Amino acid sequence: MDMANWQNYRSTVNGMPAVFTANIEDVEKYHGKGLDKIVQFTIDYQADDETGLPSEVEYDKLINRVFKILTQLTALPNVFFAGHFICNSQIKIHFYCKHENLIVETLQQIDFVKDINVQKDLIWDTYFDFLLASPLEIKLNATEELLDLLKSKGRNLSDTYLVEHSFHFDEEQKMFPFMDELSLGDYSFTTLQYSAQAIQFNEDDEPYFLVKLEQEISLENSEIFEQVERFEKLAEQFSGEYIGWECDSLLDSNKPLN
């Protein structure tokens, strides 16, 4: 199993920090193929602090246990590893299957496995609505990572940055009401630009209309996260797509921020 095909991101569960992993490899091979039962179980670990997350040493120990289970369960027929999440001194792991008996029997022989549970999940709600990251979660995680990148380059996040947000629309008539909302609503920006014609870089790409909004903000506080969440919801409201943001400090090296 290739970890490069695991989607990893941070979120929260019941107000506690959580680290999610979703397996995005061969989903089409298993989804809709009769694997309508989900087997869920937990492994306890020693939390590092009040966050409930493991230390680096404890994490390595935990992942070794996870791989021990993966090796055994993925060798069984008609089994798909959906993912897991780490939160509040536990990792909860999810597998889809046609028949749960062999999985349950295998898990019952592993002394550190707890709380084995089997449920029907005909349309994979747990995978698509819980384990898999939403577009907003992906952008928030990218924002966190790229603020760390700025700091690693010696930049002070309390400085004022020129931040450019980008939006795509598949139809021109969707773009203009969106821009009206930005202009008339409570949105702070220095410039607002759009493409007069649809953009299509490659023959196979779907053409789109582009809107770019620039604003000057500090990246020291939560404002950039609030802006990302606000623009994600606004673009969705007008049937567009919020692509993400980049800033002047990294534009020179053509490094997009998400």
From Swiss-Prot:
Pfam families: DUF695, RraB. Gene3D superfamilies: RraB-like. InterPro entries: CHP01619, DUF695, RraB-like_sf, RraB_dom. It comes from the Bacteria. This is Uncharacterized protein HI_0040. It comes from Haemophilus influenzae (strain ATCC 51907 / DSM 11121 / KW20 / Rd). The lineage of its organism: Bacteria, Pseudomonadati, Pseudomonadota, Gammaproteobacteria, Pasteurellales.
